[in-house]
Amino acid sequence: MEAGEEPLLLAELKPGRPHQFDWKSSCETWSVAFSPDGSWFAWSQGHCIVKLIPWPLEEQFIPKGFEAKSRSSKNETKGRGSPKEKTLDCGQIVWGLAFSPWPSPPSRKLWARHHPQVPDVSCLVLATGLNDGQIKIWEVQTGLLLLNLSGHQDVVRDLSFTPSGSLILVSASRDKTLRIWDLNKHGKQIQVLSGHLQWVYCCSISPDCSMLCSAAGEKSVFLWSMRSYTLIRKLEGHQSSVVSCDFSPDSALLVTASYDTNVIMWDPYTGERLRSLHHTQVDPAMDDSDVHISSLRSVCFSPEGLYLATVADDRLLRIWALELKTPIAFAPMTNGLCCTFFPHGGVIATGTRDGHVQFWTAPRVLSSLKHLCRKALRSFLTTYQVLALPIPKKMKEFLTYRTF
C-alpha cells in the first residue's frame, strides 16, 4: 500500500467454534499482538482461548492475489521444523496480551537458572491478562505455561514488557492499580503503582524504557518513571475515559485515545499537547444523535513513526499521517476493538467484537533523511536537551515535532 491508498483486506481469521457461540458474551477479541521480531501473532479469540500463529500466515489464510504482498522470503525457507500454531486455554476471558522481546544475555542466564526445563533458545514468552486478575506467562515455541502471577483483584486489562529485554512486565487493571513484575525472579511483584481513581484501561512503556504511560476512566493520563516508579506528571485534556495509549518509536511522542472521539498527541517530556485528531462522522447514514458512534477503541504508531492507526465505534479503521489533522485513508470494519502494526510495517491487524481478526495493507513509504535523523537523535535526546542545543529555532521545532 502506497501513502494515500485505501487499506485492502489481506486476510480474515475466524475462531473455529460452533456458530451458537457467535455474538455471545466473552467472544470478543480484546487484544492482538505481534512478537517484536515479527515471527508470531497472538490473537485472543474469545471464550478463554488465545491462538499463537507463526507469521507470515500460511497460504490457506491468504486470498489469491495477495500472496506476494503479505508473505516474506522467510516463508520460502519453511520446512518440517517450522513453528506450528498453538492453542492456549487460559481458563478465563483474556483481555490483555503482550510478547516479551528476546531477552538480553543477562536475562537469558537468569531465566535458565530459574527455569532449567526451558531451553535457552525458547526464551520468547507471551503474557495474558485474565478476567479474574491473574496473569499467565506462556513459552511461545512450546505453548507451555511457565508462570502464574497473582496480585490484581480485578480484570487485567493491558500488559506491556520493557523493550530492553530485561523481562520486566507492567500490568494495568480494573482494580485501579498498575503492577510491576520481574520474570527473572519467578515473576516477583516488585512495585504497585496507585493513584488512578477508576479502572486503568491501558499501559505503554516508552521504547527507551524511561517512561510508563497509564490511562484510566477518570479522563486522566499518568506518566511514571520506569527508573524510580514514581509519578512524573498528569496529562489533562480528554473529556471522557482514556482507553488506549502508545509511544512513538523514538519515545518523543505519546498518543492517547478516548471515548471523547479524540486522539491527543503529547510531548511526554514537557506534557505539552501538540495536536488533536478528531474522529468526525463520515457516513451520512449514521445517526448524529448517537453520541457513541465515534468513541475510540484503539490507537497505535507505525514502526517508522510516521503514521497512526485508530479504531472507533463508527465502523472505520483510520490511518493518519502525523503532519495532517485528517485521515489519509479509511477502511470499513464492523465492531472493531483493537489494532496493531506489524513490526516491520506494511500490515495492520485489527480485532473485533465477534472474535475475528483482520489483516489490512498499511502505508509503506521510504522515510526522508530528515525524519531518519530526527528519529535517531530523539531516541537518546529529551525535549529539554534538544531545546538546549545551539541550533536554529526552526531546527528545534522540527526535532521536537512542533513542525514537520
UniProtKB/Swiss-Prot annotation:
A Pfam family hit: WD40
WD repeats: 16-55, 81-140, 144-183, 188-226, 230-268, 283-322, 325-362
Cellular compartments per GO CC: cytosol
Coiled coil: none
This protein's pathway: Protein modification; protein ubiquitination
Domain SOCS box intervals: 356-404
Keyword Repeat among UniProt keywords: yes
GO terms under biological process: intracellular signal transduction; protein polyubiquitination
Keyword terms: Repeat, Ubl conjugation pathway, WD repeat
InterPro entries, per database record: G-protein_beta_WD-40_rep, SOCS_box, SOCS_box-like_dom_sf, WD40/YVTN_repeat-like_dom_sf, WD40_repeat_CS, WD40_repeat_dom_sf, WD40_rpt, WSB_SOCS-box_domain
Start and end residues of each stretch annotated as Disordered: 68-87
Domain notes: The SOCS box domain mediates the interaction with the Elongin BC complex, an adapter module in different E3 ubiquitin ligase complexes.
General function of this protein: May be a substrate-recognition component of a SCF-like ECS (Elongin-Cullin-SOCS-box protein) E3 ubiquitin ligase complex which mediates the ubiquitination and subsequent proteasomal degradation of target proteins.
Name of the protein described by the UniProt record: WD repeat and SOCS box-containing protein 2
Gene name tied to this protein: WSB2
